[in-house]
């Protein structure tokens, strides 16, 4: 990307983050674009922000059972976390009442799965879209 394109990426990412401050993918765009612009302080800032949000998710459990599921507030956070862990999502199942189970494979082909508590997402959906 050219410097002008990178500046445009930064502008758009900031606009999106103003509306959705937990958008990990836009933060990654800021790391990428600022790196190309040699803006080291911004790169470090956004890398730290990503790590803090990922750490916040990981601190909610271990993802191995529904009882220890990781809490997420956006469905995409599950896939962002899995990407951070270096695994590849293979399949998805919803496990009532409020868990997403994602089967993954690591780079060697070992299979396992992780649970994500999506209760906050479901509550927000109910609040906004379901007629009483």
Task: Give names to the regions the model predicted.
Residues 1, 14, 30-35:
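Conserved small-residue packing positions in alpha-helical repeats and bundles
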Residues 1-10:
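Helix-turn-helix repeat elements of alpha-solenoid scaffolds
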Residues 15-16, 50:
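Canonical positions in the second alpha-helix
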Residues 22-30:
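Glycine-rich, often proline-containing surface loops adjacent to acidic residues and nearby aromatics
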Residues 24-25, 52-66:
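Boundary/linker segments of alpha-helical solenoid repeat arrays
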Residues 34-58, 86:
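TPR/TPR-like (Sel1-like) alpha-helical repeat modules
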Residues 68-132:
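Terminal, low-structured helical/coil segments at or just beyond the last alpha-helical repeat
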């Amino acid at each position: 990307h050219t410097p002008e394109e990178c500046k445009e990426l930064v502008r758009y990412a900031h606009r999106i983050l103003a509306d959705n401050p937990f958008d990990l993918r836009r933060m990654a765009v800021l790391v990428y674009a600022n790196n190309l612009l040699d803006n080291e302080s911004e790169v470090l800032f956004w890398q730290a922000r990503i790590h803090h949000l990922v750490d916040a998710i990981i601190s909610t459990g271990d993802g191995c059972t529904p009882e220890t599921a990781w809490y997420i507030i956006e469905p995409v956070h599950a896939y962002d976390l899995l990407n951070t862990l270096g695994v590849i999502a293979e399949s998805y199942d919803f496990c009532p009442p409020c868990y997403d189970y994602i089967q993954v494979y690591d780079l060697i082909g070992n299979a396992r799965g992780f649970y994500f508590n999506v209760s906050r997402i479901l509550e927000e959906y109910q609040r906004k879209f379901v007629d009483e």
